[in-house]
Every structure is written in C-alpha cells, then in structure tokens.
From Swiss-Prot:
Localization annotation: Secreted, Extracellular space, Apoplast; Secreted, Cell wall
Known glycosylation sites: N128, N145, N280, N352, N364, N392, N463
Claim: Transcription regulation is one of the keywords in the record: no
Chain positions covered by the region annotation Disordered: 199-219
Keyword Signal included in the entry's annotation: yes
Organism of provenance: Arabidopsis thaliana
Protein name: Polygalacturonase 1 beta-like protein 2
Length: 624
C-alpha cells in the first residue's frame, strides 16, 4: 500500500468507524457488500446511499447497481480532485479508460508521408489517412467493408487525392451498421482533374452517423462525386458539407438515396458549389421516407456560372422535415434549378427559401408538384415557375407510419394474456458506459454557458462529432419542461435516486425489461400484473442520453398505468422475457405529429399510448 492509498484508507476508516454503516452480508443479489469487496468503491457507496434513502422493503436490482462506476476508491478520489481543480483534461485518456466512458479513440498523428500506389482496403477500420493519392496520375483506391459493424468508428481523411489527375476513389459498405460514426474528410480531392469519387452504402443502418466534408473537391476540374445509399436508415447524426465543390469547373455531383428512411438526420451544406462553373448536381430520393429530416443549404451555388441543380423526390413521403435554403443560387449567372415532387410530406414540414435565385442572371427556377408549408422570401421574380402546388397532404394510412417501427407504440387493450403482438427493437444502441461517482459529477461543468469547458474536459474539438453530441445532450437537458412535466438530467446514480424520491417518496421500486429476447419478433403476452393495482398512478421514467458518461434524462409522468408481463415464445409458449410497459393515459400535451399517432391513428388527448421500457431505460414507481 503506497502513501496515498494509506492516507485515503485512514481517512475513510475514520469517517465510517463513527457512523452506523454495516458492510457484512451476501453478494449483490442481496444488495449488500461481499466480505472481499472494498467498502470504499463507488458501487459500495451507492449501496449505502440506497440503504439510507430508500425504504428497506424495496429490492436493490442488479441492473441498477451494475451501472455504478468501476473506478477504484483511489482513482475516484484522484479524478475528483483533478475535476475540482479544472485539470481533468490533462488525464483525458486515463480517465476515459478507467471510468469506462464513451470517448473517441485517438487516431495516430497525421503524417506527411505520401502514399503513391493504388490501395485496396477491405475489412479495415480506425485509420488516419493523410496524403493518400496526392498528386497521383490515374489509378484507383478502394475501401470495402471499412469500419463495418464497429461500435465506434472514427476515421480521418486529410489531403486525400489532392491535386491528382484521373484518380478514382471508391468507398463501398463504409462504416455501415456502426453504433457511433465520426468520419472526417478535409481538403479531399482538392485541385483534382478528372477522376471520380464514389460512396456506396455509406453509413447505412448506422446509429448516430456523423460526417464532415470540408473543402471537398475544392477547385476540382471535371471530377464527379457520387453518393448512393448514403446514411440510409441512419438514426440521428449530422452530416456537414462545407465549401464542397467550391470554385469547381464542370464537376457533377450526384446524391441518390441519401438519407432514405433515416430518423432525424441533419445535413448542412455551406458554400456548396460557390463560384463554381458548369456544375451539375442532382439530388434524387434525398431524405425520402425519412422521419423529421433536417437540411440546410446556405450560400449554395452562390456566384456560380451555368450550373444545373436538380431535386427529384426530395423529402418525398417523409414525416414533417425542415429545409432551409439561404442565398441559394444568389448572384449567379444562367443557373437552372428544378424541384420535382419537393417536400410532399405526410405531415406538414417547414421550408424556408430566403434570397433564393436573387440576382440570378439568365437562369430559371422551377417547382413542380411541391408540398405545403413552403415560405419564399426575397426570391427573384423573373424566371421562377411554380406548378401543381399540392396541399392534400394526408396523415392517414399505412404509408404514413412505415417509418414508425411496428410494435413501438400500442394500445392498452393489447396487454391481455394470450395476445400475439410484434415486439419492437428494444436493444440498447448506445455505447456501453457507467455513471460517474457523484464527487466527480458535481465538479464537472454541465451547461450551455460552459460548453467550451465541457469540450476541453472530454477532448472534443470544435465542430467535431463529439462536440455536437455533447452540445445536443446539454441543450436537451436545458429544454424547458413540458406542461405538467418535472424533469432532470442525472449523471450519477445518487442523483437519480434523489430525483425519483423527490417525486414519489422514499418507498419506490425501479424496473426495466428483463432482457432483449424476443426483440423485433412476435411474442405472446403471458401473465400480466398491473403495478399499484393497475390504477392510474405516477412514475418517473429515465431514458439514456448520448454523452461521454452515463447520462439519463428523467422526467415525472403523472398519469400512467404501469404493467409487468411475461413474454412467451409464440410456438412453445415458454417464457422468454419479462417486460415492463408504461401506458400514458393523458396525451393531450403531445404533438399531433408524434410517432404514436402516426402509428395508431387519432391525436393528442384522444387515446392512451403504451410502449415498452427498452434495455437500460427504467421506470420508478411507488412500491406496492
């Protein structure tokens, strides 16, 4: 035992020898500490906190205790001291590793070494590509099954194919089915002549796909870029294109099947095609069948000459969605922009065209069969044609709810023994993390006013994916509570206990669905038990937020019914899972565009809506 450990042990011994604390007993199943377990670990501290703040009759569930920090007592004290002195960033890698946090892996430093030969990467991941294909004459580089299926895929491409001639790049099945993707393309194909870049099945079926294309194909001459099935079926995430094809000459770009079937994926195009000559860009089936796709075009095609931009089936058949076109094709010469089947959403979206085609000389803009909800401000009055404006958008029928997974929402009447129903995907898609000890959390910044400090602590560079993830979580936590809602974001198990007991009292129990068996399959409802006698009751529901450490968004739900039920295999009728479902009785404050109403029909306040508690989410209730 070194001097630090000895000092800590004596300090802890003095504190606890004078307090009424018992460390004897059985293993975690009994909610006590084993004789061999250090009584000063974060987990041991959590068990004592539970004993002191929750009535003794309430069971200590293993799934909750398992989320305690794995830090040793010494490390917990050391990192707490660093946090209180604003020096935790100096031990970022050590902290991430010891506390089992979600941190992006550190890529090898950028190298100035040139790679002049053709490369063929298959089943490869975690690479920093610098100067690949630079100054190349012809040849091709191929990336197949790159970063596929990874939990966290972080790749950086810098100066790739820069100043090359006739050089082709192909990305096939790139970062598909990953959990969190962070892909960076900086000065990619800048100053190239000819050649092509092709992205096929890029970030397909990814959770939280994030990509940044900066100065991509800047000053390129005749180089084509194709994005096919890009971020298809992706979940959340942000894709940014900055100065893409800027100052290019005759460089066609094609987006086909971009973001199709995705859920809340944001895309930003800034200075895309600015001052380009003879650009030819087409967006086909862009954001089609998506749920709330958000796209921003800022300074797109500004100052261009002779460009042709085509949008076909753009955001067609999607749910809601938000598009913003600012200074699009402004100050351009002879540019043509065609929108066909634009924004025919099932639920009214929001589209703003500001400074659209303004001062465009000799060009024309046409809208054919475009949806309701568009706003056109300061656009050129000459050369803009509007045809077949459509406002017969309907939110009825199966076509509307195809993006809402079957079984995600259901009616209370389904919770009857013998009912055959579809189970949604209840698997936790987020990276595995743990809570931080409270003595560390209380010393960490967590507000929009200190966002820069948070980025520094967790090594998140400005405009990086991690910076966006952190900002999004903080913003959601600071969002004002809905009418009748009490909410709090918690980063320690003790904080969650405090919030739950402040709403429900000390006699509480916490539940979650037992496992993920039956997920995405048909199941039969077995024995059903209504919590609190099946009466309308109160609950505190806690849902994970993506953040470096385990962060939960907890909120009070005042009028619900909560059920436990056995889930049976449809063929053998054997028990395969024990599910927890919550039914919201009062939905009057919900948005009319909520996925529950698209899936079930009806609207706010007209029906109750039920859903399962997914893996690693939980609900707190008053103990029976």
């Amino acid at each position: 035992m070194n001097n630090i450990e000895a000092t800590l042990f004596l300090c802890f011994f003095c504190i606890f020898s004078s307090s009424n604390v018992h460390f004897a007993g059985a293993k975690q199943t009994a909610g006590n500490i084993t004789p061999s377990e250090n009584p000063f670990t974060p987990k041991a501290s959590l068990i004592r906190y539970w004993n002191n703040h929750i009535n003794g009759d309430s069971p200590k569930p293993s799934f909750f205790l398992s989320k305690a920090s794995p830090l040793t007592a010494v490390d917990s004290t050391r990192f707490a001291s660093l946090a209180s002195n604003h020096a935790l960033n100096t031990h970022h890698s050590d902290f991430c590793s010891a506390a089992k946090l979600f941190c992006f892996p550190e890529l090898a430093a950028h190298s100035l070494e040139k790679h002049g030969d053709d490369v063929n990467f298959a089943a490869y991941s975690g690479k920093n590509f610098t100067n690949y294909g630079s100054d190349r004459l012809s040849g091709a580089d191929s990336f197949k099954n790159y970063s596929g299926g990874d939990n966290i895929a972080v790749d950086s491409f810098r100066r790739y194919s820069r100043n090359s001639a006739g050089h082709d790049d192909g990305f096939t099945n790139y970062a598909g089915e990953v959990n969190v993707a962070d892909q960076s393309f900086t000065t990619y194909a800048t100053g190239t002549t000819g050649g092509s870049g092709e992205f096929t099945n890029y970030n397909t079926d990814a959770n939280e796909p994030n990509g940044r294309f900066t100065s991509y194909s800047d000053k390129a001459n005749g180089r084509s870029q194709t994005f096919t099935t890009y971020s298809e079926n992706g979940n959340t995430g942000y894709q940014s294109f900055t100065s893409y094809s800027k100052n290019g000459n005759g460089a066609p770009n094609e987006f086909s099947g971009y973001g199709t079937g995705s859920n809340v994926v944001n895309t930003g195009f800034t200075k895309y095609g600015e001052s380009a000559n003879g650009a030819n860009d087409s967006f086909t089936s862009y954001g089609e069948n998506g749920n709330v796709p958000v796209n921003e075009f800022k300074g797109y095609g500004d100052g261009g000459n002779g460009a042709v931009y085509g949008f076909k089936n753009y955001r067609d058949q999607s749910n809601i969605g938000v598009d913003s076109f600012s200074s699009y094709a402004k100050n351009s010469n002879n540019e043509k922009v065609n929108f066909v089947n634009y924004g025919k959403s099932f639920n009214l979206g929001s589209d703003n065209f500001t400074g659209y085609g303004q001062d465009n000389v000799g060009g024309n803009v046409s809208f054919k069969t475009y949806g309701q909800g568009q706003s056109f401000k300061v656009y050129t009055k000459d050369g803009v044609v509007f045809a077949r404006y459509s406002n017969n958008v309907s939110s009825n029928g199966k076509t509307v709810n195809k993006w809402v997974e079957e079984g995600k929402f259901f009616r209370e009447a389904m919770l009857k023994e013998g009912t055959l129903m579809q189970m949604p995907d209840i698997k936790d898609k987020m990276p595995k993390r743990t809570f931080l000890p409270r003595n560390i959390v209380k010393n960490l910044p967590f507000s929009s006013s200190t966002i820069g400090e948070i980025w520094r602590v967790f090594g998140a560079g400005e405009n990086s994916s991690m910076a966006g993830i952190i900002s999004s979580a903080v913003s959601e936590c600071e969002r004002p509570a809905s009418h009748g809602e009490t909410k709090r974001c918690v980063g320690s198990a003790e904080d969650m206990i405090d919030f739950a007991t402040s709403v429900l009292g000390r006699g509480v129990v916490v539940r979650t669905t037992e496992n993920v068996v039956g997920s995405k399959k048909k199941v039969v409802i077995g024995k059903v038990n209504g919590i609190n006698g099946g009466d309308v009751t109160r609950a505190v529901s806690c849902h994970q937020s993506l953040y470096p450490y385990l962060l939960y968004y907890c909120h009070s739900v005042p009028r619900v019914r909560v059920y436990e039920t056995d889930l049976l295999d449809p063929k053998s009728l054997e028990k395969i899972n024990h599910g927890v479902a919550i039914c919201h009785i009062d939905t009057s404050a919900w948005s009319p565009s909520h996925g529950a109403f698209l899936a079930l029909g009806s609207g706010p306040g007209q029906i109750e809506v039920c859903h399962w508690i997914f893996e690693n989410d939980m609900t707190w209730n008053i103990i029976d």
